[in-house]
Every structure is written in structure tokens, then in C-alpha cells.
Swiss-Prot record:
Species of the source: Escherichia coli
Record's GO cellular component terms: cytoplasm
Keyword Transcription regulation listed: yes
Alphabetical keyword list: Activator, Conjugation, Cytoplasm, Plasmid, Transcription, Transcription regulation
Predominant localisation class: cytoplasm
Designated name of the protein: Protein TraJ
Localization, UniProt: Cytoplasm
Gene name in the database record: traJ
UniProt keyword annotation of Transcription present: yes
Function comment: This protein is essential for positively regulating the expression of transfer genes that are involved in the conjugal transfer of DNA between bacterial cells.
Amino acid sequence: MYPTDPRQLNTERQIYLDKQFFVDVFSIPACVRNTNGDLSATNEKFSKEFIGSLDIKEWFYSLPVQVATSFLREELDAMSLPSSMNKIQSVAIGDKLWLVQFIPLIYGEVVNVLWLFFCKNSNVIVDYCRGLRTNITNDRMLEFKNKSTEIQWKVFILYSFGFCHESIASLLSITNGSSRNAISEVYKFFGIHSKHDLLMIFHTSRMHSLFFDELFFILKCAE
């Protein structure tokens, strides 16, 4: 049922758009679940990887009971302890292994949870990734923010949220080459060699509030 107060309708529409925006910017499977347990937003990668011919409402219930239970436990922890780091290191869905992260999205009194799926069936060694997440601290991330130029930091934020170099160049009024050079400096600073490594650092840094605020500021300035 639609709200009778137009202002409430606008607020609910904005919340929906915000959630859809969050999942659309990711280049990995991502979804948002609300407090009713419904998938309120999914991106194309998620639909292609997990939904297929399924009814989207049935996806969660199609998972093995043990997997669904572990997902639900982490999701509830994310809702009740927004500052905690909630993730499942390795879970099989279909024929692939995934690292799944649960990030609370808070809209006033309403808490939804963003789910991010990192495929572990790649050429990345699990132990290396675990060490990478451990070694990149919040202080190191802030050190990069303080040492980088304004453009380097903005490119880092946009690229990590899934924007391609062409889009970044257009948003920031720079060349594609400048965007690529900025990412090369990011790799050099953190001692990494691939976008997968960068995403692991980005999404396990526990600094999502800062990153989301920075993203909205960048996009607002580009309007």
C-alpha cells in the first residue's frame, strides 16, 4: 500500500534509489536485504550469478539450510552491531566458493544490509588474501588519504566502487591516462598488483561510512 503523505512516498522512493545505487556501482555480485528478509535491490552481476530462472523471492530459500542459516546469523549481527566486521570467509554456492561480506546501511531508524560476494575461484591464494586484509590497517588507509593528491583519492574511491577509467575521466574532467596513473600510484602505495587485491583492501577496511560519504560528495560536486 502506498503512503498517503506524498512526502513519505518521496522518502521511500529515495531510500529505494539509494539502495539500488549502492548495488549498481559494484562490479561484483551485490544485493540489499531489508528487515523483512526481502531482496530490495540487486545488481546485474548478482542476478546473472545466482538468480537465473529463479523467482528472486525464492533465492534465499533455495540455498542449503546450513548456508542460509550462516548468512542469516551474519546479517543479524551486522544489523545489531553496525561497527563490526561481518563476513563469511568461504561458502559454496553452486560450483564456486565465495567470501561474503555484510555491511549495514542505515536510513534513520531503518537498517538494511548490503551483501557483497567475492569469488574465491580465482588465481588469488586464500592465505595471501587473508594476510593482505590483516596488514592493511585503517591507519594505513588514512595515511594514503593524507599523502595522495585530491585527484588520486577521488580516482581511488570511484575506481573501487566500480567506475571505469572513462567514466572517472568524465566525472573529474581529467584524461583516461591520468585516471590510470592514479590507480598505479594506489597499487604502488599498498604494494598490490591487481584490481582484485584493491577490492579486498577496500571492502575489508571497515571504513565504509567514510567511503560512502566520499563517493556522494564526489558525485554531488560533479553534477
